[in-house]
Curated annotation (Swiss-Prot):
Keyword Amino-acid biosynthesis: no
Biased composition (Basic and acidic residues): 1-14
Phylogenetic placement of the source organism: Eukaryota, Metazoa, Chordata, Craniata, Vertebrata
Record's keyword annotation contains Nucleus: yes
Record organism: Taeniopygia guttata
Gene3D superfamilies registered for this protein in UniProt: 3.30.70.330
Protein name as it appears in the record: THO complex subunit 4
Homology family: Belongs to the ALYREF family.
Length: 254
């Protein structure tokens, strides 16, 4: 401070300028050095961050790549079956729906007094029965036929050989071995034919009766008109002359 007091203003200004320049240079050097030093770690840190962040960045990329390699929601089986088969057959329902096991007999020419209990008692001695029933109509009257279903086909054949042609209550039984396919095809055909016959009868009765009535009415009308014309044409010449004279007389008076 004493030196500056003794110095002139110009010298003080020069000194201040030189000190400022030195301080700036020192700061700049320190700053550069600090930057260099600090930059080294800073850059290293950034570099380390990049290096450390590289795997972080690469991990999502790997995850994306791994996501592409992940299996799809629906994966195709490695080994395909040689022969396609419907899933319905796995449960056994579809396979056994149209095929009926055992033996089934159709007994006909039965007396109308034979009941279900009589049929069951008659055929139960040959084997286990699944069903034995007489066929009845809607009014409850016997149709003279019955179904006898054995669990084993061999038992059904034995019963048919034993009882076919044997009289029951005075009427020989007619026994036939049938299959489920034939029986299912036969029964719907009977129901359709019965319905068709009933409908045809009703149609024929309705339209036929109406046609006859209409024809009768038309015939009556035709006959009435024809009879009237015939009666007019049967007038004699004298009657026609008399009618003409009467008409002329009316015209003259008017």
């Amino acid at each position: 401070m004493a030196d500056k007091m003794d110095m002139s203003l110009d010298d003080i200004i020069k000194l201040n300028r030189s000190q400022r320049g030195a301080s700036r240079g020192g700061r700049g050097g320190r700053g550069r050095g600090g930057t260099a030093r600090g930059g080294g770690p800073g850059r290293g840190g950034v570099g380390g961050g990049r290096a450390g962040g590289g795997p972080v960045r690469n991990r999502p990329v790997m995850a994306r790549g791994g996501g592409r390699n992940r299996p799809a929601p629906y994966s195709r089986p490695k080994q395909l079956p040689e022969k396609w088969q419907h899933d319905l057959f796995d449960s056994g329902f579809g396979a056994g729906a149209g095929v009926e096991t055992g033996g089934k007999l159709l007994v006909s020419n039965l007396d109308f007094g034979v009941s279900d209990a009589d049929i069951q008692e008659l055929f139960a001695e040959f084997g286990t029965l699944k069903k034995a029933a007489v066929h009845y109509d809607r009014s409850g009257r016997s149709l003279g036929t019955a179904d006898v279903h054995f669990e084993r086909k061999a038992d059904a054949l034995k019963a048919m050989k034993q009882y076919n042609g044997v009289p029951l209550d005075g009427r020989p039984m007619n026994i036939q071995l049938v299959t489920s396919q034939i029986d299912t095809q036969r029964r719907p055909a009977q129901s359709v034919n019965r319905g068709g016959m009933t409908r045809n009868r009703g149609v024929l009765g309705g339209f036929g009766g109406g046609g006859n009535r209409r024809g009768t009415r038309g015939g009556n009308r035709g006959r009435g008109r024809g009879a009237g014309r015939t009666s007019k044409q049967q007038l004699s010449a004298e009657e026609l002359d008399a009618q003409l004279d009467a008409y002329n007389a009316r015209m003259d008076t008017s």
